Amino acid sequence: MGLVGCVGKSSLVSMELRWARRRKSDNAASALPRSIPIYISTLKKDINLEELRNLYSLCNHSCNRLSEKDSNVEKIVDMKKLRRAISRSDVIVSVFCKPQHVDVDDAVLYSEEESLSSSLYTSEFGRQNKDDSFLGDLFQNAVPLTPSNGQLVGFGRAYSDYGLTASIHDLMVLPSLQRMGIGKLIVNRIVRLLTSRDIYDIAALCFEDERPFFKACGFGDDRMGSTTMMFTKSLEA
């Protein structure tokens, strides 16, 4: 796990509809469309906590930085802590796509873990599966993509002191939609929001195998060669 820094600047958009495209060499996802529309939001009101918690699980992303990197995430942070973390995060970026554009395995896992009682996205149209009728798919494709009818497939957040420094945490993209540039879009949006507030000392808390990705996003080692250290000593009564 390390700490890397970045500098950047650009304009602000709180909501945006973009297209994500798969690489031609990515044969693993050949059954899925090569280009899909995605909805990018920086509004906290668009986040459904139950869907976000499911995304943590689907991405095998743990909030516990002391856990093993490759171990399965059996217990996600509880809902109260997650709600508090989101409410106190300074920057939130979420990405949505239409449910039929998600890999069927991810869709099945998502459906099994989704709590319908707390979901904001239940509607009379339901979520589309590959065996749905042609008319149902046609209608779903015609409906404009929004957070209310889309599935949360990407997420990232940042904390700052509102003056000097900020750090990026919990960057996630649904496995079947990785390698489409969605993660880079999330990082770039976070950086633009922070630099618009005149905050340029931006760090990313990441694992060693994530460093090449952040390097491609413009991050690098700081001048002091510093690294992150976690408190590991048990507190004595």
UniProtKB/Swiss-Prot annotation:
InterPro entries on file: Acyl_CoA_acyltransferase (IPR016181), GNAT_dom (IPR000182), GNPNAT1-like (IPR039143)
Keyword set includes ATP-binding: no
Record: transit peptide: 1-93
Pfam families linked to this entry: Acetyltransf_1
Catalytic activity: an N-terminal L-alpha-aminoacyl-[protein] + acetyl-CoA = N-terminal N(alpha)-acetyl-L-alpha-aminoacyl-[protein] + CoA + H(+); L-lysyl-[protein] + acetyl-CoA = N(6)-acetyl-L-lysyl-[protein] + CoA + H(+)
GO CC annotations on file: chloroplast
GO molecular function: glucosamine 6-phosphate N-acetyltransferase activity; N-acetyltransferase activity
Family indicated by similarity: Belongs to the acetyltransferase family. GNAT subfamily.
Protein name, UniProt field: GCN5-related N-acetyltransferase 3, chloroplastic
Gene field: GNAT3
